[in-house]
C-alpha cells in the first residue's frame, strides 16, 4: 500500500490458494459427505483473509480479488496485467503453509516474467527504499529486472551496481551506468570477485555491508513440464534473503 501511494499507483490484494479438496484429496475417498466439510474449510479461510485485509489496509486505496484452485496459474496470469507483483517469502521450515505449493514464489516469478518484489518473512520491510544494490549481469533477466526497478531507482538516494567477474569490466560499467544515467539514475559501480562456494550468500552479505534497503537482480531458472528449477544464486537469495528483492525472469 505504501509503495503504491509513493508512486501514485493502484494496488490490488489477491487471495489465491489451493482449495481444501486439492490439499486433502484423500478426504474424498472417505465419502461424498466430506465435500461440504471441505467447502466450509475454504469459506472460513477466505473470510479470515478478508478480515485481515480489512484490518490492514485502507480499502479505498487498495482493491481485492479472489481466486481459488490453481494459485500458480492464477497469480502468474494476473501479474501480466500489472506493472509489479509483490510476494512474501516463504519460510523454508514452515510446514503449516499448505495453501500454495512449496515453489510458489520462484514458479510465479519464472512463469509470469513480470518484475516481482519479494518481501522477506523475517524482517519488516522498510518504509523507504533509499539504498539500492543492483546485481548486474549482461543478460535479459538482469535487464528486465533493472527496467522494472526504474521507478524505485529514480527515488533512491543511493544506487550501487555490482558485477561479479563479468569479462570486460570497463565496458560493463559504461553500459549499465550509462543506461541508468539516461533514465535519470546516478549509480556507482563496483566489481567483485566471485567466490566459488556461493555467490548468492556473497551477494546477500554485500547487501548487508552496504546497508541496502533493496536488492535488484535477475532470476535465473528453467522449466520442464510443470516443474521449475532455479539457478544456484537465485535459489540462495530467495531462500535466505533478509531484505526486499526485486527479481525478474
Feature map (PLM): residue ranges:
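P-loop/Walker A phosphate-binding loop and immediately adjacent motor/lid segment at beta-alpha junctions
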Residues: 47, 51-59, 95-120, 181-190
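A short acidic, glycine-rich active-site loop
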Residues: 33-48
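Small/aliphatic-rich secondary-structure junction motif
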Residues: 1-33, 111, 124, 128-193, ...
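Structural beta-alpha unit
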Residues: 12, 18-21, 54-85, 183-215, ...
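Short secondary-structure boundary segments
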Residues: 15, 89-90, 218-220, 249
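Active-site phosphate/pyrophosphate- and oxyanion-stabilizing loops and adjacent acidic/basic residues
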Residues: 1, 106, 147, 204, ...
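Intrinsically disordered or low-complexity boundary/linker segments at protein termini
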Residues: 75-77, 83-163, 240-249
Amino acid at each position: 500500500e505504501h509503495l503504491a501511494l509513493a508512486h501514485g499507483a493502484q494496488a490490488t490484494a489477491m487471495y489465491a490458494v489451493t482449495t481444501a479438496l486439492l490439499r486433502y484429496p484423500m478426504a474424498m475417498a472417505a465419502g461424498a459427505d466430506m465435500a461440504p466439510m471441505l467447502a466450509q474449510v475454504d469459506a472460513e479461510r477466505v473470510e479470515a483473509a478478508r478480515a485481515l485485509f480489512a484490518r490492514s489496509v485502507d480499502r479505498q486505496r487498495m482493491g481485492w480479488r479472489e481466486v481459488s484452485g490453481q494459485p500458480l496459474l492464477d497469480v502468474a496470469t494476473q501479474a501480466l496485467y500489472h506493472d509489479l507483483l509483490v510476494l512474501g517469502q516463504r519460510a523454508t521450515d514452515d510446514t503449516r503453509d499448505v495453501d500454495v505449493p512449496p515453489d510458489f514464489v520462484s514458479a510465479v516469478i519464472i512463469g509470469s516474467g513480470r518484475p516481482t518484489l519479494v518481501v522477506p518473512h523475517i524482517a519488516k520491510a522498510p518504509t523507504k527504499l533509499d539504498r539500492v544494490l543492483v546485481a548486474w549481469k549482461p543478460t535479459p533477466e538482469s535487464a528486465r529486472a533493472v527496467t522494472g526497478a526504474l521507478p524505485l531507482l529514480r527515488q533512491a538516494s543511493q544506487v550501487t551496481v555490482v558485477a561479479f567477474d563479468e569479462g570486460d569490466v570497463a565496458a560493463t560499467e559504461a553500459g549499465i551506468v550509462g543506461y541508468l544515467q539516461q533514465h535519470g539514475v546516478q549509480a556507482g559501480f563496483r566489481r567483485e570477485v566471485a567466490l566459488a562456494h556461493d555467490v548468492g550468500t556473497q551477494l546477500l552479505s554485500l547487501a548487508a555491508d552496504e546497508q541496502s534497503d533493496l536488492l535488484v537482480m535477475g532470476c535465473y531458472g528453467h522449466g520442464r513440464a510443470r516443474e521449475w528449477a532455479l539457478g544456484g544464486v537465485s535459489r540462495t537469495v530467495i531462500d535466505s534473503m533478509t531484505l526486499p528483492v526485486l527479481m525478474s525472469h
